[in-house]
From Swiss-Prot:
Protein name: Bifunctional enzyme IspD/IspF
Catalytic activity of the protein: 2-C-methyl-D-erythritol 4-phosphate + CTP + H(+) = 4-CDP-2-C-methyl-D-erythritol + diphosphate; 4-CDP-2-C-methyl-D-erythritol 2-phosphate = 2-C-methyl-D-erythritol 2,4-cyclic diphosphate + CMP
PANTHER family membership: 2-C-METHYL-D-ERYTHRITOL 2,4-CYCLODIPHOSPHATE SYNTHASE, CHLOROPLASTIC
Species per Swiss-Prot/TrEMBL record: Allorhizobium ampelinum (strain ATCC BAA-846 / DSM 112012 / S4)
GO molecular function terms attached to this record: 2-C-methyl-D-erythritol 2,4-cyclodiphosphate synthase activity; 2-C-methyl-D-erythritol 4-phosphate cytidylyltransferase activity; metal ion binding
EC code(s) of this entry: 2.7.7.60, 4.6.1.12
Region annotation 2-C-methyl-D-erythritol 2,4-cyclodiphosphate synthase: where it falls in the sequence: 248-407
Site (Transition state stabilizer): 24, 33, 280, 379
Keyword DNA repair listed: no
Cited function: Bifunctional enzyme that catalyzes the formation of 4-diphosphocytidyl-2-C-methyl-D-erythritol from CTP and 2-C-methyl-D-erythritol 4-phosphate (MEP) (IspD), and catalyzes the conversion of 4-diphosphocytidyl-2-C-methyl-D-erythritol 2-phosphate (CDP-ME2P) to 2-C-methyl-D-erythritol 2,4-cyclodiphosphate (ME-CPP) with a corresponding release of cytidine 5-monophosphate (CMP) (IspF).
Pfam short name (any one): YgbB
Amino acid sequence: MVHIQADGARSTAVILVAAGRGERAGASSEGPKQYRRIGGKPVIVHSLLGFADLLPQATLIVVIHPDDGALLANALAPYPQLAASLTITHGGKTRQQSVLAGLRALRNQKPDYVLIHDAVRPFFDQLMLQRIIARLDDGADAVLPAIPVTDTLKRGDEGARVVDTVARSGLFAAQTPQSFHFAKILAAHEDAASAGREDFTDDAAIAEWAGLTVHLVEGSPDNVKLTVKRDLEMADARLSHNALPDVRTGNGYDVHQLVPGDGVTLCGIFIAHDQALSGHSDADVALHALTDALLATCGAGDIGDHFPPSDPQWRGAASRIFLEHAANIVRDAGGTIMNADISLIAEAPKIGPHRQIMREKLSEILGIALERCSVKATTNEKIGFVGRGEGIAAIATATVVFQGKPQ
């Protein structure tokens, strides 16, 4: 990651505007659109992490709605260092009021530059920020990232009839972060508020009204504002497509003693035998090992944590219950089970004749394709307790893919 710094000793602040309600994106249990998840993280977190990475020396001000404190705290819970670096202030009824609140929060610090950014534009990039800072360093009072309008523009009337085709030459679509010399944009905002002007749609317009020259720099086609539900869906798809695969492997091992009996249960299949496996449940050593392997992929402890042998309710229980529980934990954590592999170590009974039905049982329990389930067996060459026929051991490996981290 390349860090961007202003020229010399100039200080920089970023105001992230996140006080909107986002009605056009529709209702969601996650809250306003800046708190909805794309690529596994809330939109606002993507934006904050971007500035923290690219402008690590900048002061970060987050302007939120007074009702959104808990939403922001929850969004930042996995990022305590980032959360500790932020200054949080409450916005007003309009974006203009919210930006002014953010500017006022910087009055004591008096940074040289301030970048004002919509929290729901998480796809700004390094090159665009470099162009903005360079233009400020060159002496510009106000810098606006923008992209040329490429669509043909039509003006319509109240009857939904085209009355004019607007020449697109010289027209640009404004983006953020809109960036300024701090003292000048603060004064412009204060003057606009004193004049009762609440009709500005962006900060560059206030700068123009105040007589500042606004300089254009090249924006980014990717730096879109997430406005409606479809925007959020497309952003999530984009991040998921670009994600680095989060492939996790868990291992499990278990062993049970053989005692006199009439058969053993392995991989959920009962096999007639002159011995049985001793255990609190049905002693299915294979499913116990695989249960631990699955739990390991998401740091969820081991089988004893979830089904303690001291609990009488699990006496004689079918071990598929344990495996199903572990699989549900993995799925609830966002994981997809890709492969389950079990190696049984036993002198007897013979596993080969039952291997296929064991694989089918694993496929059924886990809800994954048969080709993703493997059962193998070997003896211990008459060595040790397994070699003496005193027990059966199992080693299991589970492969799980979780939603990846965007690049």
